């Protein structure tokens, strides 16, 4: 059963985002807020995803939620091939690394883009942490608002908690695979699930 007060949780999460922007709060507060609601007895439905390849080429599925999923969109006159490209381009831009920025824009392979993102010069962890969530939200907002078929899929997830069930990512994912016993128990997640929260934020804005 999905409780009707889901919107209250989303509002609380969005308030945490605003507060974090204004007061430099940690983005771990997003997970903390969800956990607090669960501890009070609220229950939610969950949609776990991981990977960017569709099972059937003709049918949009949850693979479209991935940062690596191929989906063209434009922001401020610049064309992007996937949200991984946007995220890493903005990372390079944030630290004024024009060389890596241009290399990222001229590469559409998300694996290579991710590697380039790790080469950004003058990188400072605290600065990236302060900006990463908003960057991913903006990239996904453009992706889903400019691709109607993808937007319809995201909206079809309704009130589900979106979970990046990556066993190897404890920042953007939950640090657990979808078939793990705790994948649908946020109280036992090993990661922050920032991508999942960003997608839910975008869903609310569409």
Located regions from the model:
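Charged, low-complexity intrinsically disordered segments
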Residues: 2-206
């Amino acid at each position: 059963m999905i409780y009707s007060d889901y919107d209250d949780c989303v509002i609380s999460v969005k308030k945490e985002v605003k507060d974090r922007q204004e007061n430099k709060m940690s983005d771990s507060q997003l997970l903390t807020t969800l956990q607090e609601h669960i501890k009070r007895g609220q229950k939610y439905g969950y949609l776990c995803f991981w990977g960017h390849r569709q099972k059937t080429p003709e049918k949009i599925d949850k693979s479209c939620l991935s940062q690596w999923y191929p989906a063209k969109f434009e922001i401020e006159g610049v064309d992007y091939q996937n949200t991984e490209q946007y995220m890493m381009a903005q990372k390079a831009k944030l630290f004024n690394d024009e060389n890596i920025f241009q290399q990222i824009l001229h590469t559409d392979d998300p694996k290579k883009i991710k590697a380039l993102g790790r080469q950004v010069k003058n990188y400072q962890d605290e600065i990236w942490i302060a900006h990463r969530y908003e960057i991913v939200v903006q990239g996904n907002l453009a992706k889903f608002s400019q691709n109607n078929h993808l937007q319809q899929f995201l909206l079809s997830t309704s009130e589900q908690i979106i979970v990046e069930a990556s066993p190897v990512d404890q920042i953007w994912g939950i640090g657990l695979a979808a078939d793990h016993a705790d994948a649908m128990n946020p109280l036992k997640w090993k990661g922050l699930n920032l991508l999942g929260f960003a997608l839910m934020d975008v869903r609310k804005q569409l």
